[in-house]
Amino acid sequence: MVTIEKIQDAIIEAIKQSGMKQADLGEKIGVSQSTIAHYLRRRIMPSLDTLSRLCTALDLDANEILCVERPKDF
């Protein structure tokens, strides 16, 4: 089961792995550096729209982060 903590873990790990500065990532996705810092400190959770932009900026698959299974091809 997906939990908020698992989503946060995935986001935090991806941000750290990216090597991007918080300010640069924030500018890229349209949020402030302090908002990125709040994500890293688990104070707030990004909206789905922001999560989508984060995934794009960090080259992540949103389905994996949200633990959504993709339909299998028949």
Predicted regions span which residues?
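Residues within the helices of the helix-turn-helix
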Residues: 12, 23, 34, 52
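The alpha-helix within a helix-turn-helix
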Residues: 15, 26, 55
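Short, charged recognition helix plus adjacent turn
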Residues: 19, 66-74
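DNA major-groove recognition helix of helix-turn-helix
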Residues: 40, 58, 66-69
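DNA major-groove recognition helix of helix-turn-helix/homeodomain DNA-binding modules
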Residues: 49-64
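Recognition helix of helix-turn-helix/homeodomain-like DNA-binding domains
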Residues: 30-45
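A short, Lys/Arg-rich alpha-helix, primarily the initiator
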Residues: 1-20
